[in-house]
Structures are given as C-alpha cells and as structure tokens.
Regions:
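Glycine-rich nucleotide phosphate-binding loop and flanking beta-alpha elements
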Residues: 68, 95, 116, 204-205
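Glycine-rich, phosphate-binding/catalytic loops in enzymes
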Residues: 78-80, 104-106, 177-179, 214-217
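Divalent-metal (often Zn2+) His-rich catalytic cores of metallo-beta-lactamase-fold enzymes
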Residues: 181-239
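Active-site metal-binding motif and surrounding structural segment of the metallo-beta-lactamase
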Residues: 68-111, 193-196
Length: 239
C-alpha cells in the first residue's frame, strides 16, 4: 500500500472534474493510518472511494465502488490479513454499491433506501457500535439532501466517513440543498468529536472537519426566508 497521506488539508476542495488526470488512473491503495486504508476513486466508470478499516477479526469496508478490479483487490487483502469482510454501504448510488454482488462478505449494513436496491443484508435503523481493543466504530444514519437513508461510519472518534451525504440533490436541471437537512448536518458535525471527515470523490480524501463545517455554513447562509431549498448555481457555490 502507498505511503501515509497527509491529514492536515486546510481547506476543502471542489469535486475533481472529469479532466483531472488523477481520475484517469486505475484505482490504487492509499493509507491513512496503519489500520485505515482506501482504494482511490475513478471517473470512467464513476467509482467511489472504498475504505477499509482493519479490526481484530474483520475488515470493515465502507462502500464497494463500481470499478471492475475492486472485488479482486478486496479479496486479496482479505486473504493476506486472514480476515473476512463486513461491508457498510453509505447510500444506494451505483458508484458506491455496484460491486457488492462480486464480493464475498460476512455482513452487509445499509439504510432502508439502499436495501431497496440490494435486497440483501441488514437494514440499519439505530446506531451500531463495534468496540474492539484497537478499533472503535459507530455506524449511524446521516441526514442527506443527496441520498435519503445515508449511513456514516465513525472510526476511533477521529475519522468520520460520510460518502456523498454532504453533497446536494439534483431536482430536474437544478442543484439544491434542503435547508433543514443541511442545518441538521452542520449540528451533527459540530457535536462530533472526530476532527476529520472523509467525503467521497474529493481530494484530499481526509478533510479537517472545521473546514467542512465552514463550507456548509456558507451554503446555509444563502437560504432565503420561507424557502425549503437552497439553489446552487455556478455563481454562488462556495469554495
């Protein structure tokens, strides 16, 4: 696996566009810590970050992507570590769940909306806590404009994996945030002990939580009175 990536990005960056050369590479392994690695995202086909948390007995995999070589990559690390795989799916979009049918897993956790697409595994309706010697995990529901029924994964109270939960929704030709949901997200992040959050398709993958909160607060400040939706345009999207 690749060398440790930097954790101290000062500002949140925009989603990489299709011309970014990093997205034209094959997905590869990168390390965050000695227990936390991930497979990089791709654009063609669109494939999300695949995170792997190594516990005492299992490899906890958050999202499985859509790129065709990811199941083989996960099978190889499972074999090397001698540990079975447990999967958490952030939400139902294909770039996050398409490979689930090609992966051998012990358990599969997802929101109710995601289950409508997979028809397998367990629906998470309340927090799931995993308490091991070196790894402490919490799987919990995260409100989202982008995808109803999203799940987040908190790792050792330091890293919170959010998938696409903080991104806007697309309603017809409009890109929008639900103002009420956005406020809930900001409040959840502020109460969370973790100093870092991880958003799919972003670079760097690990972001300072406070930078992300500031980004969301700029969007929330654009809301109009008595309007449930915040319209995003090319002119008002904050950096």
């Amino acid at each position: 696996m690749a060398a440790d990536m930097r954790e101290n990005s000062a500002e949140i960056t925009k989603i990489q566009d299709v011309d970014n050369s990093n997205n034209k590479q094959f997905p590869t392994w990168k390390c965050v810590t000695d227990y936390f690695s991930y497979i990089t995202p791709a654009i063609k086909p669109l494939s999300a970050n695949v995170s792997v948390i190594e516990g005492e007995k299992y490899l906890w995999v958050y999202d499985v992507g859509s790129y065709e070589n990811i199941p083989e990559m996960l099978a190889e690390i499972s074999k090397q570590k001698g540990k079975k795989i447990k999967i958490i799916l952030s939400h139902f979009h294909p770039d996050h769940i398409a490979n689930v049918q090609h992966i051998k897993w012990e358990s599969l956790y997802q929101g109710k909306n995601t289950y409508k697409y997979t028809h397998i595994g367990e629906i998470v309706e309340s927090d799931i806590n995993v308490d091991e010697t070196d790894i402490k995990l919490r799987i919990f529901q995260m409100p989202s404009s982008h995808a109803k029924g999203s799940l987040a994964l908190l790792v050792n109270n330091k890293y919170c994996l959010l998938g696409d939960a903080l991104y806007p929704a697309h309603k017809g030709d409009k890109t929008v945030y639900n103002a009420g949901i956005l406020k809930q997200q900001i409040d959840i992040l502020k109460k969370m002990a973790a100093p870092y959050v991880l958003l799919s398709h972003r670079e760097p993958f690990v972001q300072k939580k406070q930078a992300v909160i500031s980004w969301l607060e700029k969007i929330y400040a654009m809301r109009e009175k008595n309007e449930p939706w915040i319209l995003m345009t090319g002119q008002n999207v904050p950096n």
